[in-house]
Amino acid sequence: MLTDGSYFHLHLVSDSTGETLITVSRAVAAQYANVSPVEHVYPLVRSQKQLDRVLQEIEESPGIVLFTLLESELVNRLEAKCQQINSPSLSIIGPVMQLFEAYLGASTTGRVGAQHTLNAEYFKRIDALNYSMMHDDGQHVEGLEEADVVLVGVSRTSKTPTSIYLANRGIRTANVPLVAGIPIPHQLETLKKPLVVSLHASPDRLIQVRQNRLLSLGAGAGNDSYIDRQAVTDEVLLARKLSAKYGWSLLDVTRRSIEETAAAIMKLLADRQRQRMSE
């Protein structure tokens, strides 16, 4: 058993980019805050020679081995070696593929990296990313009607990172800051197509994040309106009033990660689309 503060070797072996392995393993490793994985990522492992080099490194630094390999000979060799050196191994996609095969009554194509084919979904993500970068932080508001989602909120409510995250899911996302004393763009008042989501956070949380931001910029944490409690509270209240006035969806991001915020927005978007289809 590992003790607090220790580390372990985590070997990620893939015949493609390794993105699936990295995402899954980091999500699981995050649940064990007292130990740290040392990641060894081996992408594009598609031959016996390439696998030999991987097996040598695993033998030199034994640990958990996760893999996404479709070639059965490579899988058998990897599993045999792991068993020999007592390193636990697991295919991340194997059980999922077996479930699909049992339900669909069809075997897989065995096509390596099929999920990375340049299909319509890929180009949809690229289009969404381009759109979101062009419409970040209130830029080009004349194009807001072309968005799937428009995020609004006061400073430091994670509008930009949430926009990029959603864009990576193929969702065209614009974001517009709500600033005290500055009227909102008139385009926001008449939007029909996009889902407008107003991101909110508690004044305490906003002050904390803004102070950290100022310190990172070397600006110090002076008592200006950016972090003044009353001023920040007024900003939050103004944002809520605007949301109520225009019927924007409210989402409290005080204790949400970017991923959780994006997931909540995607649910709102899906619910809205289902409602429109039923009308």
UniProtKB/Swiss-Prot annotation:
Known EC number: 2.7.11.32, 2.7.4.27
Full protein name: Putative pyruvate, phosphate dikinase regulatory protein
Keywords in alphabetical order: Kinase, Nucleotide-binding, Serine/threonine-protein kinase, Transferase
Key word S-adenosyl-L-methionine present: no
Organism annotation: Rhodopseudomonas palustris (strain BisB5)
Residues bound to ADP: 153-160
GO terms assigned for molecular function: ADP binding; ATP binding; phosphotransferase activity, phosphate group as acceptor; protein serine/threonine kinase activity
Keyword Nucleotide-binding: yes
Pfam families listed in its UniProt record: Kinase-PPPase (PF03618)
Transmembrane segments: none
Coiled-coil regions, chain positions: none
Family (UniProt): Belongs to the pyruvate, phosphate/water dikinase regulatory protein family. PDRP subfamily.
Reactions catalysed according to its record: N(tele)-phospho-L-histidyl/L-threonyl-[pyruvate, phosphate dikinase] + ADP = N(tele)-phospho-L-histidyl/O-phospho-L-threonyl-[pyruvate, phosphate dikinase] + AMP + H(+); N(tele)-phospho-L-histidyl/O-phospho-L-threonyl-[pyruvate, phosphate dikinase] + phosphate + H(+) = N(tele)-phospho-L-histidyl/L-threonyl-[pyruvate, phosphate dikinase] + diphosphate
